[in-house]
């Protein structure tokens, strides 16, 4: 089976072609970072309009690079949610329209299921079951995964997600958009300076996350300290360590609760070097293994949507012709594949 994947949930237009026998044949991505940089964050209306401009040329490019004709496709997968509703509808409209015009089955894919399954695109792919840490700009969650669609959300963010906390803290430090990667780069030049940053919600039972208080603590620290480059780097390091430690503590708890020894980390924050190193140490200490996608598939992309959609189309799942987007969509409501 060969599937065209379309991702437009936020500010990246991602298109890919995936074949269940040959693997990933092509993927094309357009990032809107420069478009939104002047505003310090994603402007939903601008994001939607840019998807409209870029999506068709990218589809043509992906099909050409995959040496794939319309007749070679067996289905179309597009991101149905969660995400920005205007951006979602661009991908949904194009995906459903092409499916109708080409007489192909189509399916709307859950964006976070795409991230969760992104490590399956690698040669060293995890086997079920495992615990997944999904960390992005909009989500932070721990999920018990026993198969595709067999998900139990063990904990999630009650306010700011980890990626959102990175971006907001970067803005407090005067760093340009996108702030998360820039903060991590600044933190790499920092040194331990005795800051006592909290590890939110680790002093109580449970697996939920909260990062809004940590952001406020950082803001107060910035205001009280000298405004020089090294001090900012030291604060950035302390903040990053606090976020990573918090995620690691919660992962240990989730692994102990489930008894699993495989951990998947995915989503934009999974590209963070300190997070990867820390979780690798955690898994080594318990005789387990950590899995994550390559850097280009940590952020939003069409490859993960094509892969996830192919699994569901191959299992016989189909949707009607209605164009639908779901800005909010609980992961654990997805039907399982047996």
UniProtKB/Swiss-Prot annotation:
Acyltransferase keyword on record: yes
Top-level taxon of origin: Bacteria
Cofactor: Fe(2+)
Pfam families per UniProt: TsaD
Presence of keyword Chloroplast: no
Reaction(s) catalysed (UniProt annotation): L-threonylcarbamoyladenylate + adenosine(37) in tRNA = N(6)-L-threonylcarbamoyladenosine(37) in tRNA + AMP + H(+)
CDD domains named among the record's database cross-references: ASKHA_NBD_TsaD_bac
Family annotation (InterPro entries): ATPase_NBD, Gcp-like_dom, KAE1/TsaD, Peptidase_M22_CS, TsaD
GO biological process assignments: tRNA threonylcarbamoyladenosine modification
Subcellular localization: Cytoplasm
Family assignment from sequence similarity: Belongs to the KAE1 / TsaD family.
Protein name stated in the entry: tRNA N6-adenosine threonylcarbamoyltransferase
Organism per entry: Shewanella putrefaciens (strain CN-32 / ATCC BAA-453)
């Amino acid at each position: 089976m060969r599937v065209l994947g379309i991702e437009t949930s936020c500010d990246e237009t991602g298109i890919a072609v995936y074949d269940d026998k040959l693997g990933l044949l092509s993927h094309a991505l357009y990032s809107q970072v420069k478009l939104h940089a002047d505003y310090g964050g994603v402007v939903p209306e601008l994001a939607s309009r840019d998807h409209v401009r870029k999506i068709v040329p990218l589809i043509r490019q992906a099909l050409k690079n995959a040496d794939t004709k319309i007749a070679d496709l067996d289905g179309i997968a597009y991101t149905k949610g969660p995400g920005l509703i205007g951006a979602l509808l661009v991908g949904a409209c194009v995906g459903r329209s092409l499916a109708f015009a080409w007489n192909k089955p189509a399916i709307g894919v859950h964006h976070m299921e795409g991230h969760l399954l992104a490590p399956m695109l690698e040669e060293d792919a995890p086997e079920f079951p495992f615990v997944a840490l999904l960390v992005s700009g909009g989500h932070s969650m721990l999920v018990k995964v026993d198969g595709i669609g067999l998900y139990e959300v063990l904990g999630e963010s009650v306010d700011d997600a980890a990626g959102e906390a990175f971006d907001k803290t970067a803005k407090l430090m005067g760093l340009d958009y996108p702030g998360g990667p820039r903060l991590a780069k600044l933190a790499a030049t920092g040194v331990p300076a005795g800051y006592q940053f909290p590890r939110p919600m680790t002093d109580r039972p449970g697996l939920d996350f909260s990062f809004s208080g940590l952001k406020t603590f950082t803001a107060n620290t910035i205001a009280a300290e000298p405004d020089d480059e090294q001090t900012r780097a030291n604060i950035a390091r302390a903040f990053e360590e606090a976020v990573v430690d918090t995620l690691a503590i919660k992962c240990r708890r989730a692994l102990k609760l489930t008894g699993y020894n495989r951990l998947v980390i995915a989503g934009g924050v999974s590209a963070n070097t300190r997070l990867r190193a820390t979780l690798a140490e955690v898994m080594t200490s318990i005789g387990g293994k950590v899995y994550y996608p390559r850097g280009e598939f940590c952020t939003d992309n069409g490859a993960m949507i094509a892969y996830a959609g192919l699994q569901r189309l191959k299992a016989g799942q189909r949707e009607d012709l209605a164009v639908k987007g779901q800005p909010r969509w609980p992961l654990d409501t997805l039907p399982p594949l047996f």
